[in-house]
Swiss-Prot record:
Name recorded for this polypeptide: Probable nicotinate-nucleotide adenylyltransferase
InterPro entries in UniProt: Cyt_trans-like, NadD/NMNAT, Rossmann-like_a/b/a_fold
Family named by the database record: Belongs to the NadD family.
EC numbers on record: 2.7.7.18
Key word GTP-binding present: no
Enzyme class: transferase
Sorted UniProt keywords: ATP-binding, NAD, Nucleotide-binding, Nucleotidyltransferase, Pyridine nucleotide biosynthesis, Transferase
Gene: nadD
Annotated source species: Nostoc sp. (strain PCC 7120 / SAG 25.82 / UTEX 2576)
Length: 208
């Protein structure tokens, strides 16, 4: 049985923080590959065109053989939901033990996800703690235990692992804001991604 991790998200744009999280998962958990899955129509978010986000992911991950980018959501209609993505990937990759990489803030909302109670036991959860808000590892672990307890009340089981990652205070929203006001995003994203953003005028008033 192979062990694969899904890293789903908007990735608008992908940045070094995302890459550090994925690399930490590879180093700390016995998984063979990280499958990056950009959301086509993420719930509660307005994102750049899918083709741009997919292209930036491919540029950022092309030098790591343990990273692969999936366009599984490309032809899906409606809102992108995690359980549909995992179901589709399971068809493409049978006989797989699945992991799902997620940030702590997002993991906290898992009990309220679309069919979240059904999704929770389908994979192990690899959680990137949010340290920029002042939380420490102990507080992050407590939050994870609270989520597990909520799901247990609904007769669901869940397995989670807290990833140990360096503190990187960068977010996609910050990068978009900086670029929009003409500030440098060098060293916040891979250079190929920065060049792509400039070439396609993403995050500016006259973006494609």
């Amino acid at each position: 049985m192979q062990h694969l991790a899904v890293f789903g998200g908007t990735f608008d744009p992908i940045h070094w923080g995302h890459l550090l999280i994925a690399e930490a998962a590879l180093q700390q958990i016995p998984i063979e590959k990280v499958i990056w899955v950009p959301s086509l129509n993420p719930p509660h978010k307005k994102a750049s065109a899918f083709r741009h986000r997919l292209a930036m992911l491919q540029l950022a991950t092309q030098d790591n053989p343990a990273f692969t980018v999936s366009s599984v959501e490309k032809n899906r209609s409606g809102v992108s939901y995690a359980i549909n993505t995992l179901t589709d990937l399971s068809v493409c990759f049978p006989n797989t033990h699945w992991y799902w990489i997620v940030g702590l803030d997002t993991f906290q909302t898992l009990p309220r996800w679309y069919r979240g109670q059904e999704l929770a036991p389908m994979c192990d959860w690899l959680i990137a703690p949010r340290l920029v808000g002042g939380e420490n590892i102990a507080q992050s672990e407590l939050i994870c235990k609270q989520v597990k307890q909520q799901l247990r009340k609904q007769s669901d089981t869940i397995h989670w692992h807290l990833l140990h990652i360096p503190l990187v205070g960068v977010s996609s929203s910050l990068i978009r804001k900086l670029y929009r006001i003409g500030k440098s995003i060098r060293y916040l994203v891979p250079e190929d991604v920065r060049s792509y953003i400039a070439a396609h005028k993403l995050y500016s008033e006259d973006s494609e």
